[in-house]
């Protein structure tokens, strides 16, 4: 199989050079007199090979000998990386040993030792390996002339056939809606300002961007609207002069004689502004992401006639962004039905398709294989054109893109260009994604962690951390349509997946259902689909794979179901794979691992043990000094971490969600590389105190701090230094009910100490989300009311049962969500909820000016919600959703004016007084209203008081007597679509349904005093009405059943 190698290998070689020129490695070579030339030999061989890599990439496509040379080079580079990694790992081990030494004198002595000192004992073996690697590289370098490889300074793109504006519309299916959507922007109903705007069509290679632009270009409305149309196929070469010249020749209808760009652009500008007619320029297949080039090209068009447009097709979202497109149309794959029509047209032309059952079944599977890609449909259909042999159809079905006949397929060249022009650092990342099975949806963060483990993220000239670089790389691939976002995850189109496999070659292997595991001695990356039980024989082939780096079981579903892994695999086979960098045993029913399981896997950077049944981790885990990622989420039996986990000084990501841990081991603060720590458990006496967080300066994302009742020393809390952790965005503070009397003590001294501790846990002002759960103090910290927390968007207060008042949160400028629940001591909400003591003097600021969701839940003693007047604006001016749930003692009314409220839910608030008459105008935008087991004073409900009400639910309102249409309002409830009434035992009056909207859904159940069933009102049966059904049950005349009636009738009319 042909592979793609040059820039892929260039990224490897760049990383190798960085290691070789680093001071520790140069010191190592200088200290060994017999090997002082080894470094120079190795560097020279690498430089010689690098010079011919560009030529090698081109020639390996058609020359099997060059392909073999490239694959041999990749294998040697992997071995070189392994050797250098051995040196770095040994240095790490000795450094950690020095730091852990109990002897200060020994620690100081070792601290002064060089890497060469560390390696004296093992240097002979390591130097022998490097010598072998150097010899292999020198041999490959010497073969460059024999293979005819030349030194090239730049990649020469292979010219593809240019596109034209012509299209055969009989061969286009399923693009009418796309065409209509883009036409709205090309020819808008309303006029536009002078100048030119850009519309972009973005999509994966082969999805039909050019075809769609051809349809638009040749549309009759487009021809009549635009005075001049120009089609320019740009491809990889963005030549401003050539494009400008072509536009000029199209506008003037004569050859261009100008050779100076400035003169040409001036002349073109004069012609465009002089005609007064809009023009259309199509730039097909645009790749250039240089804003300066685009800015130069657009200069003559800036003052073009009103309505002028540039239509761009590109695979890159970034191109569309750079060109400031007013509309970006993300072109989606065709439906299976449209693909079938195109396939039949391609295979049989204008003849009637003639398919027997066997070929018909194969045809459906081939069409499905194309996954909506028109180019793939036409390519596979073209290979089978008028082909009647079943064996040929089966061959095409099972073929991969590189297996198709070169003279009949342009699918691979079209897709390959997406890879060809990737930067070097992205090629390795993209090729690695070949380990994902077709159809597998993957998480962005996990892929970044895998790339990081494999060493693909290079910080050469960047101040960004590895995770930020990985996210940047991922976004680049997504922008280029190589990765596609679903609702929550990402996928690769099947043919892009094959392209990645094509790029990765024999170094990557997938073990999928129904396939035999195919690996070679060169295989470095392996994934397979988990099954209920993995047979040992399925993994026998791995005994020959001595240099495997990735062992990754996957699932095509998001199921959390656990599987079984044979003990032979987990305890005998895996420990022999000493070069592993990625190891996952996630979702396996593993209760224990041998004590020395990780002893020989010291190179691993990524370890996923999530959703296993492990009760404790082997101590040998603490010798994995290179480990960067440790996933232990939902290990529901795991009760403790190894004592010496602090040795993992390179650990960056530790996920402890869903474990049974109750404390962290001692010296946890030594893990200074941590970027993500999901949970920190404050220890009681023999573990890590909260002060251990103080040294973890680089924590990002979300942190949950649990067992805060164990913090009794205010100084400890201050040393946690939460206010210095500027990268944290979410913090959950959680107290628990402790088992000891001291932890349960709620005397005034104890609660005062809790408040003082919490005051010292002030987070950085960049925090965005806060949750406080089971806090045992009597007052919230002052910092919680500080308006300098300008980024907080969400606060959750749960079961803070000793607090009798809420913190002053009204002046947090960006707060959008506030959830308050389980505060049994809260009785009143008043002015201090909106303003702090200092802010009470100045009430000009609108309280809660950004709040959109407010939820009160399970506040059993809450009695009053005092209304507050402000000198400017309204309370809650942005509030959209209000929930008041399980507040049985709450009396009085709701805030009088909530102009933005669209959803109101009241549940089990019997004493709350809600009268629609009082809120008709103040809640004018209300769309959803739900009142359940609440508002005992509610007797009548005028349906037409809320003009925008879409959904009304009333359940167990004991006093409700009537739903009516108020006579003072001529309008009806025209927006109402769903009316649900249940168990309102005193309800007796309903409005005539012919006065309600025709498409209203009405459900009425268990309302026993509705005295007249709806079907007995014939005066409202008008033929022009056709309303959906109304369900009434539980009334005396419905015999207790749930019956359906035509809703053109009415219950007892008023």
From Swiss-Prot:
Segments forming a coiled coil: 117-147
Segments for region (Leucine-zipper 2): 39-53
Ranges for domain NB-ARC: 152-462
**Superkingdom of the source?**
Eukaryota
Q: Which Pfam families match?
A: LRR_8, LRR_R13L1-DRL21, NB-ARC, Rx_N, WH_DRP
Q: What does this protein do?
A: Potential disease resistance protein.
In the record, the note on similarity to other proteins reads: Belongs to the disease resistance NB-LRR family. RPP13 subfamily.
Q: What is this protein called?
A: Putative disease resistance RPP13-like protein 1
Source species, please?
A: Arabidopsis thaliana
């Amino acid at each position: 199989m042909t592979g793609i190698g040059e820039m892929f290998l260039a990224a490897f070689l760049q990383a190798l050079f960085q290691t070789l020129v680093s001071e520790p490695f140069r010191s190592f070579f200088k200290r060994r007199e017999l090997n002082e030339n080894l470094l120079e030999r190795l560097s020279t061989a690498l430089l010689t090979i690098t010079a011919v890599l560009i030529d090698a990439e081109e020639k390996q496509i058609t020359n099997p000998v060059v392909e073999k040379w490239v694959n041999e080079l990749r294998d040697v580079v992997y071995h070189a990386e392994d050797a250098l990694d051995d040196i770095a790992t040994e240095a790490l081990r000795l450094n950690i040993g020095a730091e852990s030494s109990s002897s200060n004198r020994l620690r100081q002595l070792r601290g002064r030792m060089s890497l060469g000192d560390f390696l004296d004992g093992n240097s002979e073996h390591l130097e022998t390996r490097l010598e072998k690697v150097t010899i292999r590289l020198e041999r490959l370098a010497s073969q460059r002339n024999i293979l005819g490889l030349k030194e090239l300074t730049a990649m020469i793109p292979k010219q593809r056939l240019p596109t034209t504006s012509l299209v055969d519309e009989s061969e286009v299916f399923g693009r009418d809606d796309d065409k209509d959507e883009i036409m709205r922007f090309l020819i808008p109903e309303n006029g536009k300002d002078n100048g030119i705007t850009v519309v972009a069509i973005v999509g994966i290679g082969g999805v039909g961007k050019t075809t769609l632009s051809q349809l638009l270009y040749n549309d009759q409305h487009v021809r009549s609207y635009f005075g001049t149309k120009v089609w320019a196929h740009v491809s990889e070469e963005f030549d401003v002069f050539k494009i400008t010249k072509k536009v000029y020749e199209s506008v003037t209808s004569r050859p261009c004689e100008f050779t100076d760009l400035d003169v040409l652009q001036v002349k073109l500008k004069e012609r465009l502004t002089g005609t007064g007619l809009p023009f259309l320029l199509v730039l097909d297949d645009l790749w250039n992401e240089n804003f300066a080039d685009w800015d130069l090209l657009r200069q003559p068009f800036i003052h073009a006639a009103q309505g002028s447009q540039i239509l761009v097709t590109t695979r890159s979202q970034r191109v569309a962004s750079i060109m400031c497109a007013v509309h970006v149309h993300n072109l989606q794959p065709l439906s299976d039905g449209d693909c079938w029509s195109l396939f039949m047209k391609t295979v049989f032309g204008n003849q009637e398709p003639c398919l027997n059952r066997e070929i018909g079944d194969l045809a459906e599977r081939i069409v499905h294989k194309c996954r909506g890609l028109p180019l793939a449909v036409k390519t596979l259909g073209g290979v089978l054109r008028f082909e009647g042999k079943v064996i040929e159809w089966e061959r095409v079905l099972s073929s991969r893109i590189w297996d198709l006949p070169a003279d009949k397929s342009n699918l691979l060249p079209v897709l390959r260009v997406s890879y060809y022009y990737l930067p070097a650092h992205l090629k390795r990342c993209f090729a690695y994604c070949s380990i994902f099975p077709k159809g597998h949806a993957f998480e962005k963060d996990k892929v970044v962690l895998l790339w990081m483990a494999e060493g693909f993220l290079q910080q050469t000239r960047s101040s960004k951390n590895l995770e930020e670089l990985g996210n940047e790389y991922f976004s680049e691939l997504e922008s280029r349509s190589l990765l596609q976002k679903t609702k929550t995850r990402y996928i690769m189109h099947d043919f892009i997946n094959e392209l990645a496999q094509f790029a990765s070659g024999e170094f990557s292997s997938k073990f999928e259902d129904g396939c035999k595991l195919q690996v070679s001695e060169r295989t470095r990356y392996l994934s397979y689909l988990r099954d209920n039980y993995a047979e040992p024989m399925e993994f026998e082939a791995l005994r020959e794979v001595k240099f495997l780096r990735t062992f990754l079981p996957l699932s095509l579903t998001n199921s959390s179901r656990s599987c079984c892994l044979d003990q032979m695999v987990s305890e005998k086979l895996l420990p022999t794979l000493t070069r592993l960098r990625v190891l996952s045993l996630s979702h396996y029913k593993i209760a224990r691992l041998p004590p020395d399981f990780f002893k020989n896997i010291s190179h691993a950077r990524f370890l996923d043990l999530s959703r296993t049944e492990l009760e404790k981790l082997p101590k040998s885990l603490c010798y994995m000094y290179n480990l960067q990622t440790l996933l232990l989420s939902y290990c529901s039996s795991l009760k403790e971490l190894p004592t010496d986990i602090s040795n993992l000084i390179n650990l960056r990501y530790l996920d402890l969600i869903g474990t049974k841990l109750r404390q962290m081991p001692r010296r946890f603060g030594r893990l200074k590389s941590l970027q993500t720590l999901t949970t920190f458990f404050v220890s009681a006496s023999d573990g890590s105190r909260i002060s251990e967080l103080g040294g973890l300066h680089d924590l990002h994302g979300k942190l949950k701090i649990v067992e805060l009742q164990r913090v009794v020393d205010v100084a400890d809390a201050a040393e946690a230094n939460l206010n210095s952790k500027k990268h944290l965005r979410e913090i959950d503070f959680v107290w628990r009910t402790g088992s000891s009397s001291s932890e349960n003590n709620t005397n005034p001294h104890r609660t005062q100490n809790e408040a003082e501790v919490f005051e010292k846990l002030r987070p950085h002002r960049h925090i965005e989300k806060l949750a406080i759960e089971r806090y045992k103090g009597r007052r919230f910290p002052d910092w919680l009311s500080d308006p300098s927390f300008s980024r907080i968007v969400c606060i959750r207060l749960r079961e803070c049962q000793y607090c009798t008042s809420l913190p002053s949160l009204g002046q947090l400028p960006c707060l959008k969500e506030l959830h308050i629940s389980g505060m049994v001591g809260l009785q009143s909400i008043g002015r201090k909820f909106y303003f702090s003591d200092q802010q009470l003097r100045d009430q000009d600021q609108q309280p809660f000016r950004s709040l959109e969701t407010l939820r009160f839940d399970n506040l059993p003693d809450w009695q009053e919600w005092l209304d507050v007047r402000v000198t400017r604006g309204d309370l809650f001016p942005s509030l959209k959703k209000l929930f008041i749930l399980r507040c049985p003692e709450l009396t009085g009314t709701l805030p009088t004016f909530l102009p933005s409220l669209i959803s109101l839910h009241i549940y089990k608030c019997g004493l709350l007084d809600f009268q629609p008459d009082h809120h008709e105008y103040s809640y004018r935008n209300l769309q959803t209203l739900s009142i359940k087991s609440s508002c005992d004073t509610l007797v009548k409900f005028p349906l037409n008081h809320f003009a925008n009400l879409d959904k009304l639910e009333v359940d167990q309102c004991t006093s409700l007597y009537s739903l009516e249409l108020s006579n003072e309002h001529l309008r009806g409830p025209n927006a109402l679509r769903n009316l649900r009434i249940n168990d309102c035992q005193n309800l007796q009056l309903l409005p005539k349904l012919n006065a309600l909207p025709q498409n209203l859904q009405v459900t009425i159940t268990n309302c026993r005093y509705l005295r007249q069933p709806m079907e007995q009102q014939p005066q409202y049966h008008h033929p022009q009405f056709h309303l959906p059904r109304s369900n009434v049950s539980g009334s005396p005349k419905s015999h207790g059943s749930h019956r359906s009636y035509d809703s053109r009738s009415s219950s007892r009319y008023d």
